[in-house]
Design a protein with these regions (language model features):
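AMP-dependent adenylate-forming
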Residues: 14-39, 596-598
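Conserved pre-ATP/AMP-binding loop-to-beta segment of ANL
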Residues: 26, 140, 158-159, 163-196, ...
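Conserved AMP-binding/adenylate-forming core of the ANL superfamily
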Residues: 27-81, 98-103, 160-162, 211-212
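Conserved AMP-binding A3 loop
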Residues: 38-42, 192-218
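Structural core segment of the AMP-binding/adenylate-forming
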Residues: 57-58, 81, 85-167
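Conserved AMP-binding/adenylation subdomain of ANL enzymes
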Residues: 215-236, 240-346, 356
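Conserved ATP-binding/catalytic segment of the ANL
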Residues: 435-500
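Conserved C-terminal "lid"/linker of ANL adenylate-forming enzymes
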Residues: 498, 523-526, 570-635
């Protein structure tokens, strides 16, 4: 079903029922007790109408902001569909945000109602509700909330989603005509969502995304990847509060009639994959890195013949992939060897993903080239995309039949990407889908964009909007990149750039990705701005350390945040030196300290999209960082 630029979010599912699937077909799958249970289009749309009816009875009007602080689940979809068809605005809040940030977002957006996912989050909302004057209803998605609600004596009404739906059903017949009329009156230019960017610095900013932003992005992504059909099953586990999962999974499924299954948690993702057998998944690179690390560890730890077979299979897969990607036909011998590798090794790894994956969509951060190549060797396609919350999000994505590892793919249709010289502000090149040339390469600069996927602006922040979108309509991403073999290639964020004391520019992300090839390193944070050389805070792999040194869990519960024992430092340093040879001398780590446990969202060190907050970490560990440099000078 071809989308037009007149499409709106509430039209998508109804068009699927009209043109693709009968309303009794399965739209969503949810784990209930031990099995995944189907939820039909009819159930979804009926619940949306009941929720809309309740909203109308309680004075909700077009343009009102409605909140979510809930994990991925069918209830999210019911609530969202219910508000979208009235022209209301989805404000999804990361469950991991601090009380202060949640309170700020509720008040900045002037939320009226909020759907809550867990008892812990309900407790948080009850605590901050007295400070949120526009909030009228807190809606737990669970029924056993009364005991907790008794601790609250304010004016905000607390009732479960089931109670809300039942109440709305009583007046649905009366409200039905109004709901249908309001749905038809939603315009593409109307605001659909405020997505508050976590950012690595500063106060959260509400990115204003319209129905046109979302639906246009879905349309052109399906043009770029026409292999997504109405028969797909997506497994959703990245947060729907993030624009990547919202567009690449939820909205794609709404538009294309694909099924969407919800994972129970990241910890149970592997189990859920075996149960759901997804054909498509949207992931972040960190998950792929973990799968790669585990597969390599399992494949090489057995020793003897098994390890030889595993390494031979990976090498064979690499040879086969390189031939295919060069546009040639593999020899009969290589094809036979590839089939043997598939039977002995690759099929067993694929089984752990459910066995039916056509491809994986990777986004949210740059995918290290070696990780893309590893999955390519197995015969699992990784389609890497690039974008930001402000671009709805996709700007470029890998084509199904053209893999250039280390790039984020071809410019999507109907947008223009420019590369701007950071110093002179001269636009070096402008590229579109139609100007694509597989041999084209450009100089490096800031990535800028024009198109229907660019946000309307930042909520209540006209100055920030004017900074981000210039007078010629270019949105400035703050990312550094270039074109390579016709595809867009990302270097790093401009604000991440380190300038050493010799004036040399150092982009930390590609350097960090080089060291993250090591199975001894779990996380790494580069330091070196205005310093003579590069140093790092390294979080060693807990699992591999425990195995190598026979450590107990108590070792990682020590109050000292850092590990000082030389045997552990030397163990990590072996791999630091090993991977340093891949880098220029000024990019190499000269010294490092070992952090006992990972950087986390809960400690305020990472964003919800798992990016380290550089300024926060530098400030938090300033003493340890300074000591590391002083030690170097003393030596």
């Amino acid at each position: 079903m071809k989308l037009t630029d007149q499409a709106t979010i509430p039209q998508l599912l109804r068009n699927v029922v009209k043109y693709i699937h009968p309303e009794t077909d399965t739209f969503m799958l949810e784990k209930v007790k031990d099995t995944y249970q189907p939820i039909s289009y009819k159930t979804t749309l009926d619940n949306a109408d009941r929720i809309s009816s309740f909203f109308l009875d309680n004075g909700i009007q077009k343009g009102d902001r409605m909140g979510f602080i809930v994990e991925n689940c069918p209830e999210y979809v019911f609530f969202d569909q219910g508000l979208q068809q009235l022209g209301c605005v989805n404000v999804s809040i990361y469950p991991t945000l601090s009380d202060d940030d949640v309170e700020y977002i509720i008040n900045d957006s002037q939320l009226k109602m909020i759907l809550v996912g867990t008892h812990f989050l309900l407790k948080k909302l009850i605590k901050i509700a007295p400070n949120c004057p526009t909030l009228t209803h807190i809606v737990p998605k669970f029924d056993d909330y009364q005991k907790m609600a008794q601790t609250y004596s304010g004016d905000v009404c607390i009732l479960s989603l089931n109670e809300l739906i039942a109440t709305g059903e009583k007046t649905l017949e009366h409200n039905s005509a109004t709901i249908n009329k309001m749905r038809d009156e939603v315009k593409p230019s109307d605001l659909s969502s405020l997505i508050y960017t976590s950012g690595t610095t500063g106060t959260p900013k509400g990115v204003m995304l319209s129905h046109l932003n979302f639906c246009h992005n879905v349309k052109v992504c399906l043009m770029q990847i026409p292999h997504i059909t109405s028969e797909e099953t997506f497994l959703s586990f990245l947060p729907l509060s993030h624009v990547f999962e919202r567009t690449a999974t939820y909205h794609i499924c709404c538009a294309q009639g694909s099924k969407i299954a919800f994972a129970q948690s990241l910890e149970l993702l592997g189990k859920n994959m075996m149960e759901v057998h997804p054909t498509v998944m949207s992931v972040v690179p960190r998950l792929l890195e973990k799968i790669n690390e585990k597969a390599m560890k399992n494949g090489t730890s057995a020793g003897g013949l098994k390890t030889k077979i595993f390494l031979w299979s990976i090498a064979t897969g690499s040879k086969y992939r390189n031939v295919i990607e060069s546009g040639k036909t593999p020899s009969m011998l290589l094809s036979m060897q590839r089939n043997i590798a598939e039977k002995l090794v690759f099929s067993k790894i694929k089984e752990k993903t459910g066995g039916n994956l056509k491809f994986i969509i990777s986004g949210g951060a740059a995918l290290p080239q070696n990780i893309g190549e590893f999955f390519g060797n197995l015969g699992i396609k990784i389609l890497e995309g690039y974008g930001l919350t402000e671009t709805s999000p996709v700007m470029a994505v890998t084509e199904f039949d053209r893999q250039i590892y280390g790039t984020v793919g071809r410019v999507i249709p109907e947008v223009t990407i420019g590369i701007q010289d950071a110093d002179t502000k001269r636009i070096i090149t402008e590229q579109t889908y139609d100007t694509f040339d597989e041999n084209f390469e450009s100089a490096e600069g800031e990535i800028i964009l024009r198109g229907n996927n660019v946000m309307q602006g930042y909520w209540n922040k006209p100055e920030d909007t004017a900074q981000a979108i210039d007078t010629d309509g270019w949105f400035h991403t703050g990312d550094v990149g270039k074109f390579y073999k016709g595809n867009l290639k990302i270097t790093d964020r401009i604000k991440n750039m380190l300038v050493n004391s010799f004036g040399k520019n150092v982009y930390p992300t590609p350097i960090e990705n080089t060291y993250l090839q090591s199975n001894r390193i779990d996380q790494i944070f580069l330091i070196g701005d205005k310093r003579e050389h590069i140093t790092a805070i390294i979080v060693p792999s807990k699992e591999n350390m425990m195995e190598e040194f026979g450590l107990k869990e108590s070792f990682f519960q020590d109050n000292d945040l850092f590990i000082h024992d030389e045997q552990f430092t030397e163990w990590v340093d072996e791999h630091v030196r090993k991977y340093s040879v891949e880098l220029a001398k000024f990019e190499r780590i000269k010294n490092f300290i070992l952090k006992r446990n990972p950087f986390t969202i809960e400690d305020g060190e990472m964003t919800p999209t798992l990016k380290i907050k550089r300024r926060i970490v530098e400030k938090k560990f300033a003493v340890e960082i300074d000591e590391m440099y002083l030690l170097e000078e003393a030596e």
